[in-house]
C-alpha cells in the first residue's frame, strides 16, 4: 500500500463556538502514505477545555494531492467523546473537518471542524 509513519502530536490550541482550550501533548497521528501520493491519517488525541474538561478526539483524514491544477483534497470525519454535562452535546452530532498545513513556516496544521445538523 505504501509507507507508514507515526507523528507525535505535541500540543496546540483550539477555539470555537462554546469551546476553547488546548490540545494536550501525547496523542499520535498514524499515517499511511499511499503509492498514488494520497495520505490516510488516523489521529487520536485529547483536548482540555479552558475549564479543565478532557475531551477525546479521533480524526480520520484523507488527503489527496491536487489534480489538473485543482485544489488539494483534505477532509475528515471526527469522533468526539465528551463527558456528560456542559460538553455532552458533542456526543450527539456528526462532525467533519478540513485540514490545512502551516508549512513551511511551522510544522503544524489547522483543523476546521463543522457540526452537521
Predicted regions and their residues:
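Beta-strand-enriched cores of mature, soluble protein domains
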Residues: 1-117
Amino acid at each position: 500500500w505504501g509507507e507508514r509513519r507515526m507523528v507525535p502530536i505535541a500540543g496546540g490550541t483550539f477555539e470555537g463556538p462554546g469551546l476553547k482550550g488546548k490540545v494536550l501533548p501525547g496523542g499520535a497521528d498514524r499515517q499511511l502514505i499511499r503509492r498514488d501520493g494520497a495520505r490516510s491519517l488516523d489521529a487520536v488525541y485529547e483536548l482540555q477545555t479552558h475549564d479543565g474538561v478532557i475531551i477525546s478526539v479521533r480524526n480520520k483524514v484523507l488527503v489527496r494531492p491536487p489534480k489538473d491544477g485543482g485544489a488539494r483534497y483534505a477532509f475528515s470525519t471526527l469522533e468526539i467523546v465528551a463527558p456528560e454535562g456542559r460538553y455532552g452535546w458533542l456526543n450527539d452530532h456528526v462532525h467533519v473537518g478540513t485540514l490545512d498545513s502551516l508549512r513551511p513556516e511551522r510544522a503544524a496544521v489547522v483543523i476546521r471542524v463543522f457540526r452537521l445538523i
